[in-house]
From Swiss-Prot:
This is Large ribosomal subunit protein bL17. Residues 137-152 have a biased composition (Basic and acidic residues). Belongs to the bacterial ribosomal protein bL17 family. It comes from the Bacteria. GO terms for biological process: translation. Part of the 50S ribosomal subunit. Contacts protein L32. GO terms for cellular component: cytosolic large ribosomal subunit. GO terms for molecular function: structural constituent of ribosome.
Length: 199
C-alpha cells in the first residue's frame, strides 16, 4: 500500500514536488552537478539514483519509465548512452552531496549535488601496487626495529667491557697497595739482618 512521504512536501503540493524533482534531475544529468538547497538535494538523491538504475538496465521499458519523469529527450539519451554505461559496475551511490555555505539572502542551507565520476573498481595492477607498497612499509618498520635492537646490544657490549676494565683497574691498585707494604717490610728485615751481620 503506497504511503505518503513524511514531512512537508517541497513546493507545497504533490504535483509541484514531482515537477520540481523532475526539473532538478534533468539539470543534474545535463550539467553533472547543480547547487541547490540541502533539503532539495536530499530529496533529489534517491530520485536521480533510481533513474540511473533504469538507465543501467537499458531496456525499452526502462527508457519509457524514465521518459515519464524526464521530458527532455536529449537528456534521456545522455542518461542511457553515457551515464548508465559509466555506472555499469557500480551498485548504487551514483551521486554525492557536498554542503556549502548558506545562501546570502535568506541564510538557507545550500548543497552541491553531483554525479560521482571517479572509478571505484580497482584493477589487479592497482591492488598489487598497493599490496607491494604496504609490504615495503612493513619491511622498513621491521628493519628499523632490528637496527634499534642491534644498537641496544652494541651499547650493552660497549658498556660491559668498560665496567670490566674499571673493575680490573681497581683490583690491580688494591693488589699493588697490598704488595708494596709487604715488599717494604721484607726489604727492611733484610737490611736489619745485614747490619747485624756486619756488627
Amino acid at each position: 500500500m503506497p504511503k505518503p512521504t513524511k514531512g512537508p512536501r517541497l513546493g507545497g503540493s504533490s504535483s509541484h514536488q514531482s515537477a520540481l524533482l523532475a526539473n532538478l534531475a534533468t539539470s543534474l544529468f545535463e550539467h553533472g552537478r547543480i547547487k541547490t538547497t540541502e533539503p532539495k538535494a536530499r530529496a533529489l538523491r534517491p530520485y536521480a539514483e533510481k533513474l540511473i538504475t533504469h538507465a543501467k538496465k537499458g531496456a525499452l521499458h526502462n527508457r519509457r519509465e524514465v521518459m515519464k519523469k524526464i521530458r527532455d529527450k536529449d537528456v534521456v539519451h545522455t542518461l542511457f548512452a553515457e551515464i548508465g554505461p559509466f555506472y555499469a559496475d557500480r551498485n548504487g551511490g551514483y551521486t554525492r552531496i557536498i554542503k556549502v555555505e548558506n545562501r546570502k539572502g535568506d541564510n538557507a542551507p545550500m548543497a552541491v549535488i553531483e554525479l560521482v565520476r571517479e572509478k571505484t573498481v580497482t584493477d589487479e595492477a592497482n591492488r598489487a601496487r598497493r599490496a607491494a607498497a604496504s609490504q615495503a612499509k612493513a619491511d622498513e618498520r621491521a628493519d628499523e626495529k632490528a637496527d634499534e635492537k642491534a644498537e641496544e646490544t652494541v651499547e650493552e657490549t660497549t658498556e660491559a667491557p668498560a665496567e670490566e676494565s674499571t673493575e680490573a683497574a681497581a683490583e690491580e691498585t688494591v693488589e699493588e697497595t697490598t704488595e708494596a707494604p709487604a715488599e717494604e717490610s721484607t726489604e727492611a728485615a733484610e737490611e736489619s739482618e745485614a747490619k747485624d751481620d756486619t756488627k
